[in-house]
Amino acid sequence: MKNTIRRGLCLLLLLAMTAAMAACGQKNTNTGTDEKTMVYAVEAGSAGEEVAKEKGWTVNSVQDQAAALMEVASGTSDAAIIDLLMAGAMIGEGTSYPDLTYTDRLTEEEYGIGCRKGSDLAQYINCVLGDAYQSGTMQKLAQQYGITEELLVPQQEGTFTAGEDSDVSYIQQKGTLVVGITEFAPMDYKDENGQWIGFDADLAKLVAERLGVEIQFVVIDWGQKINELDSKAIDVVWNGMTLTDGVMSAMACTNAYCKNA
């Protein structure tokens, strides 16, 4: 993992109710409200939760970012902190939450993919993503899911060398790549047939295909993602995961593949 990957290149957004929702008996728009008296819905274990706590804000930690939006829409929280990519897919005109809008950009981040500490799967995924980027497949998937190409981090072709205690071999022997996710459009979400799709989901399918195994998506408690990896309940965390210092010290992470700024 390159040392140049730092905490920072995707944006977190502060979402607040618009006046239209306030007129329906919901909480007010928070204009002029002291941010420290507000309640912020955040995904448990996320970079958004970390930022809010660093600022001394009152947080309502929920299962995932979709749940954070629901908290704001129902009036049980004043605002939510979510990723820009999800905000683009989920709020505003023509979306599930047309009366929500974003007000502030808090931090910048980069996304990476997490594997068990010491796992050679991260290197394997780097190679697959390198091929996908160089062939234009990654760019086509980004366009399909409404992600602008400038948000992609260029990937280079590489070679894979299996580790001594190879996680890749373990996954191939058991015949299934188990991917830990939360529902997070446009990265991982279900289509009308109940099948998992999205930018991350489709990239994970490419890795499973290259491995020659089936793929299984498992919804996890985001705050327990490291335990899920270490217990081998899942093989990889692939869900718009921010490359924080804590994540990179606890997991074998891929190179950054997407920005959110």
Predicted regions located by residue number:
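Sec-dependent N-terminal signal peptides
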Residues: 8-17
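Extended ligand-binding regions for polar small-molecule ligands
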Residues: 27, 46, 88, 107-158, ...
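Acidic, polar ligand-binding/catalytic clefts
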Residues: 28-33, 86-108, 115, 205, ...
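Ordered, small/hydrophobic-rich secondary-structure cores
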Residues: 26-37, 45-119
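C-terminal motif of bacterial Sec signal peptides marking the signal peptidase cleavage site
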Residues: 19-23
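Bacterial N-terminal signal peptides that target proteins for export
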Residues: 1-9
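Extracytoplasmic small-molecule ligand-binding "clamshell" domains
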Residues: 32, 42, 50, 55-65, ...
